Amino acid sequence: MCSPLPLLILRLLLLTHPSLGRHLRHRESRKIHSVVVSTWNYTDANLQAWSVLKQGPRRTRQAVIQGCLACQNLRCGRLLGGSYGPDERGNLSLEAAIMDGRNQKFGAVAGMEGIRNAILVAEAVLQHTHHSLLVGKGATDFARVMGYKEEHAVNLNTKNVIGNWTFARCQPNFWRDVVPPPRTQCGPYSPLPQYLLQRPMRQEYPITQGEHDQLAFLALDSEGLIHVASYSSGARFRLRGRVGDSAVPGAGIYADNEVGGAIASGDGDVLMHHLPAFLAVEAMRAGQSPAKAAAKVIQRVLKHNTEFNGAVIAVNRWGTYAAACAGMDEFHFVVSGGKGFLRMARVERVKCQDRKDVVDGGPKGFFTRKPMKNRKIE
């Protein structure tokens, strides 16, 4: 027979602390709102992911995979899955990743040439290996073992893109501290002598609405299960062998069922410096709202990279979501589901933070220092 002592203690606590009872009732009654969130304004792909999620519980993995496949087939952002995003040598490659919020298991591929369905290969890494990331030829070999056929994707479009880029003196590119000067001339390049190295300056990778090389999806179901996924054709004119944020856990995607998840998009090399998706989830773990977590992450990135272009979307375990961004007037993302919404695949917009409100001088000194009386103390 159970002792009545624990029940008596609980009753005493409820009598002396009424707020505890309200808190417990709130926790018991709080509902998880299923939601699919994706970066940028591609509604069809988000709707396809939602159509999978609403079929029933435990469909989050297939939902985010379907979203990535839809964008690949629909050529979301023109660069994705097509022939318009080559590296500087004219090669086409893909990267993709998926993470399970139950245990943070992660599968990814990067720099994978000749294979079209990168997100399915990333899922195969998760399911059929003890590894987290396969790159380059090794990723292609693994895809063949998994039954995926190689395709020669380079075509006339790719050759035209490279031809126009070369005619424009290989601008933009991702070289620095080399000769000849990479901002005015094409390579081949060689390192500058040490005594000629200049103060580090970075030509920020531009982001234009409708011209994206990366997309990310988050799916949360009514049981609180979360999966996140990302898919990218890589920054145009990148160096061959470059790995982007899509394939790095915590940079483009991160999820923990106990807290929530986050997805990010923007300059991948900067995102890999700071792991904003991971930081957003940890901020929510510390008690911050999705809106506060996303804003704080963007502020942190800006303080170290004053010209950063990008965004992060944070979603807590209940389905509340928010986004923050920098480097654009506003950031668009698509949401299906969530609390109190009937219309699916709705495009939501968030006004981006003004750099000058965040950066006080900055490591590169792009902005005039604010007067001391106006400085915000955190």
Swiss-Prot record:
What GO CC annotations are associated with the protein? lysosome
Q: Which domain of life is it from?
A: Eukaryota
Signal sequence coordinates: 1-21
Question: Which pairs of positions does the record mark as disulfide bonds?
Answer: 71-76, 170-186, 325-352
* SUPFAM superfamilies on file: N-terminal nucleophile aminohydrolases (Ntn hydrolases)
Transmembrane ranges, per UniProt, are none
Q: Does the keyword Acyltransferase apply?
A: no
Recorded GO MF terms = N4-(beta-N-acetylglucosaminyl)-L-asparaginase activity
CDD domains, per this entry?
Glycosylasparaginase
What the entry lists under Pfam families is as follows: Asparaginase_2
Q: Which UniProt keywords apply?
A: Disulfide bond, Signal
Tell whether Protein biosynthesis is among the UniProt keywords: no
Family listed: Belongs to the Ntn-hydrolase family.
For this protein, the record's PANTHER family field holds: L-ASPARAGINASE, N(4)-(BETA-N-ACETYLGLUCOSAMINYL)-L-ASPARAGINASE
Name-wise, this protein is: L-asparaginase-like protein GF11609
